[in-house]
Design a protein with these regions (language model features):
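Residue-level signal for inorganic ion chemistry
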Residues: 43, 99, 118, 161, ...
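Conserved N-terminal catalytic core of the sugar/cofactor nucleotidyltransferase
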Residues: 1-11, 19-26, 37-116, 122-132
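Left-handed beta-helix
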Residues: 1-6, 207-350
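Short beta-strand segments
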Residues: 11-13, 62, 113-116, 146-150, ...
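General beta-strand structural signal in soluble alpha/beta enzymes
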Residues: 61, 84-85, 114, 145-147, ...
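Conserved core of the sugar-phosphate nucleotidyltransferase
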Residues: 124-245, 265, 315, 340
């Protein structure tokens, strides 16, 4: 088989991070925010940890049209052609198809990693080793490799990957099935079974494998891409994509391709991953005091509080007394006080 040695990386940055209101807003969502207080936004951290795998010129960002200027500002060394604008959100399959088709036009030997822009990785060297291993597997095989995260708890907020038998290559397993987000009892069964992994939304494939899969399982999507492709890298691209992209069916890559394809594999990994999907997940990652409180801000004072996460975006003084298991978050004059148990409702509040 052909060797796909030209590594390209697609970073998905179109989400609005609605569960992180008020820190994350539709005008400035969480992937562009320094959530961890380290001086770099989540998308900048993502680019930083991918640089040892390939240069920024080989990275592509797919985002909503209205965030293009933020991407240019935060990743100034990324070529403008590599920043793809979705005229409207159509879930992950159309934007991945668009990015892959645009890459294919200039990089027929592309071997591709697709990753979210807003996850956190603690152990970057292990992350790089795992991705390199997956890339070496897909470089000469028509395989799709998903990165499965070894679960550390019975998490109900993630989808799961069930692994079947090991392939002839160490660490890489055939995928038996993808499972939706489970209830607690099912999540506990998955944890006990030992062959279930969190679906991190990180995929590795070569350009021909994904092109054939989209054509086989999503012929309508493939034909819309056929219509769009002649405009890529020309003045017409924005206009043509603006007209045709919104006609794509709203569908995730998991439903569109993963659950239908036979050649799907998983590489289980442990590199301190979190999807940073909610205030609760941020609390578990920030340093906590002896009462289980995590805080980020210039002047936050807690009295008789426990298991809280308190986040103030500017120089506000925040005083919290007597709360247990609460989120207190302030930004630009917007204030959220919400029980951690009810945090899935935040996207309705914002």
């Amino acid at each position: 088989m052909h060797n796909y040695s030209d590594i390209q990386i697609i970073i998905m940055a179109g989400g609005v991070g609605s569960r992180f209101w008020p820190m994350s807003t539709p005008d400035y969502p969480k992937q562009f925010i320094d959530v961890m207080g380290v001086g770099r936004s989540l998308i900048q951290l993502t680019v930083d940890r991918l640089k040892p795998i390939c240069p920024v010129e080989n990275m592509w960002v797919v985002t909503n049209e209205k965030y293009i200027s933020i991407v240019k500002e935060q990743i100034p060394d990324m070529p403008v052609d590599n920043i793809l604008a979705e005229p409207e959100a159509r879930n992950t399959a159309p934007c991945i198809a668009y990015a892959c088709r645009k890459i294919q036009k200039k990089h027929p030997d592309a071997n591709i990693v697709v990753t979210p822009s807003d996850a956190l990785v603690i152990n970057t060297s292990e992350y790089q080793r795992v991705l390199s291993k997956a890339l070496s597997y897909t470089s000469d095989k028509s395989a799709i490799v998903t990165i499965g995260i070894k679960p550390s708890r019975p998490e109900t907020g993630y989808g799961y990957i069930a692994a079947a038998e090991l392939t002839s290559v160490d660490e890489i397993y055939k995928v038996e099935a993808f499972r939706e987000k489970p209830n607690l009892e099912t999540a506990e069964q998955y944890l006990a079974a030992g062959n279930y992994y969190w679906n991190a939304g990180i995929f590795v494939w070569n350009i021909d494998t994904i092109s054939k899969a989209i054509r086989t399982f999503q012929p309508n999507l493939a034909s819309i891409m056929d219509e769009m492709a002649p405009s890529f890298y020309t003045e017409q691209e924005k206009k043509v994509v603006g007209k045709l992209f919104p006609t794509c069916e709203k569908i995730s890559i998991d439903y569109a391709v993963m659950e239908k394809s036979k050649e799907i594999y998983t590489l289980p990994a442990e590199f301190g991953w979190s999807d940073l999907g909610s205030w609760g997940s941020l609390r578990t990652l920030l340093p906590q005091d002896e009462a289980g409180n995590a805080k980020m801000g210039k002047d936050i004072r807690l009295y008789e509080c426990k298991n809280c996460v308190v986040h103030a975006a500017d120089k506000s003084k925040v005083v919290v007394q007597g709360l247990d298991g609460y989120i207190v978050a302030e930004k630009n004059g917007q204030l959220l006080v919400c029980s951690l148990k009810e945090e899935q409702r935040i996207k309705e509040f914002g």
